[in-house]
Amino acid sequence: MQPLAERLRPKTLDDYIGQKHLVGPGAILRKMIDAGRISSFILWGPPGVGKTTLAQIIANKLETPFYTLSAVTSGVKDDARSIFSKGRPILFIDEIHRFSKSQQDSLLGAVENGTVTLIGATTENPSFEVIRPLLSRCQLYVLKSLEKEDLLELLQRAITTDTILKERKIELKETTAMLRFSGGDARKLLNILELVVESDTEETVVITDDMVTERLQQNPLAYDKDGEMHYDIISAFIKSIRGSDPDGAIYWLARMVEGGE
């Protein structure tokens, strides 16, 4: 069974939550997508704000072949050469900042002549992590952290539309803890909701802040100091500090220490 975050992944822009400055009515990226014409661009924003989802929605909307490359698992030059022959596809590169200079260099020709439309996603400042020639050939769009209203909308959508959760009686009595522990990350928020619901055997699941805190202490979410969660949790830790949230900061710090940081 797919995780809740994957089951709830939006398929259209109308279902996409947040980033109204980019995909809301009349916004620049929305106009390009509706017109069926996009150029290569890079999405820069924190984890869990919809970068990958937006790229997939664009590919579906334009009915264009969609391919993904990973710096960790791909032999970029060989894989890219194969993709470039697929008829002007969209190439999505998540965490493009992890690509080496030579890996990024290998994309320049295809991006410049339009053989491929590149959509890169990064949590790091592209000015420092993406080579200048590639950055100059791409538009840069900044994705913002999800607002409280966005996260609450996502929670309501989850408990009312998900094929599994809607079969349960779920009452969101309190949401402060879930929002705080999510660090503004939609994927993390849904993971927390799924954990809390699955661990409750009552006929009606009444979600409170104390309940969420207790469940997370009993079932700490995964942390791998050498993997992707390392960066996600550091990001949540920094957001808690900036947001003057001492409880959240202590929680994320404890997660890092427990994980061997």
Language-model features: locations:
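A short helix-turn-beta junction within AAA+ P-loop NTPase domains corresponding to the substrate/partner-engaging
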Residues: 64, 131-145
